[in-house]
């Protein structure tokens, strides 16, 4: 029973602090107006209507925009893709380009 009191007290204090913390879970409040939390910013993405060719869509931003993240590798054009046909007329695609990590 004596172990239960400190445990309950710790849980109660943490619950009170979680409710009273300004700015939410990941953002501190510096006297600015409160903005809604944007999960796209956590992944260092940009909210846009359409992603650019070197970006991928990962999440959905507020106002039904797309969260566009930059790719870490550069994708080359499709000119480096070879098409080989076998005797059964099945198409097999081989990518001959090499990717380099930045």
Swiss-Prot record:
> Biological process GO terms, please?
defense response to bacterium; innate immune response
Q: Which range is the signal sequence, renumbered to this chain? A: 1-23
Q: What does the entry list under GO cellular component?
A: extracellular region
Pfam families according to UniProt: Defensin_beta_2
Point to the regions of Low complexity compositional bias: 87-102
Q: Where in the cell is it found?
A: Secreted
Listed as disulfide-bonded, the cysteine pairs are: 40-67, 47-61, 51-68
- Write down the InterPro entries for this protein, in alphabetical order: Beta_defensin_dom (IPR025933)
Q: Which UniProt keywords apply?
A: Antibiotic, Antimicrobial, Defensin, Disulfide bond, Secreted, Signal
- The UniProt entry lists the main location of this chain as secreted
Annotated region Disordered: the residues are 83-102
Described purpose of this protein according to its UniProt entry = Has antibacterial activity.
Task: Tell me the protein family, please.
Answer: Belongs to the beta-defensin family.
- The protein in question is named Beta-defensin 116
- Tell me the name of the encoding gene: DEFB116
């Amino acid at each position: 029973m004596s172990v239960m009191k400190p445990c309950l007290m710790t849980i109660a204090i943490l619950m009170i602090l979680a409710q009273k913390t300004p700015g939410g879970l990941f953002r501190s409040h510096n006297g600015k107006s409160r903005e809604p939390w944007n999960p796209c910013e956590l992944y260092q993405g940009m909210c846009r209507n359409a992603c650019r060719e070197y970006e991928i869509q990962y999440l959905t931003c507020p106002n039904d925009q797309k969260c566009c993240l930059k790719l870490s590798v550069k994708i080359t054009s499709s000119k480096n893709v070879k098409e080989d046909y076998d005797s059964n007329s099945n198409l097999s695609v081989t990518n001959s380009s090499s990717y380099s990590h930045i």
